[in-house]
Amino acid sequence: MAKKIDAYIKLQVKSGSANPSPPVGPALGQKGVNIMEFCKAFNARTEKMEKGMPIPVVITVYSDRSFTFETKTPPASYLLKTAAGLKSGSPRPNTQKVGTIARAKIQEIAELKAADMTGADVEAMTRSIEGTARSMGLVVEG
């Protein structure tokens, strides 16, 4: 018989550095999940990734307090900032541009994000990520 799902918890945790402090501890503690068990499993799964990269994670909590989790790809905004070498986007993206990014790099990001986006082709995802880049104050070249 399948386990009864009690809750889904969505968090963004930095790769390789999950610990019981907020936001992980309170979110899991409310559902009675073993926090250290999650932290060890998450850190083991993300140890090969760049340290400090924000990783969206969906934790499925079952009624017997056991859990499973699924990691996603980093947010497009993080990948764009990293590719353009920026610390943050523009506070006024319509008037103040902060950098440029090649369309080929956006295509790479779209292909990386394809695992998380269902039902969209790579061309549509590329256009979506171009829009994200423009809203961050990046100029798309190429």
From Swiss-Prot:
Protein name: Large ribosomal subunit protein uL11
GO biological process, one term: translation
NCBIfam families linked to this entry: L11_bact
Species assigned in the record: Shewanella sp. (strain ANA-3)
Assembly behavior: Part of the ribosomal stalk of the 50S ribosomal subunit. Interacts with L10 and the large rRNA to form the base of the stalk. L10 forms an elongated spine to which L12 dimers bind in a sequential fashion forming a multimeric L10(L12)X complex.
Keywords: Methylation, Ribonucleoprotein, Ribosomal protein, RNA-binding, rRNA-binding
Keyword Transmembrane annotated: no
PROSITE patterns membership: RIBOSOMAL_L11
Role noted for this protein: Forms part of the ribosomal stalk which helps the ribosome interact with GTP-bound translation factors.
Domain of life: Bacteria
PTM summary: One or more lysine residues are methylated.
GO MF annotation terms: large ribosomal subunit rRNA binding; structural constituent of ribosome
HAMAP family according to UniProt: Ribosomal_uL11
Gene that produces this protein: rplK
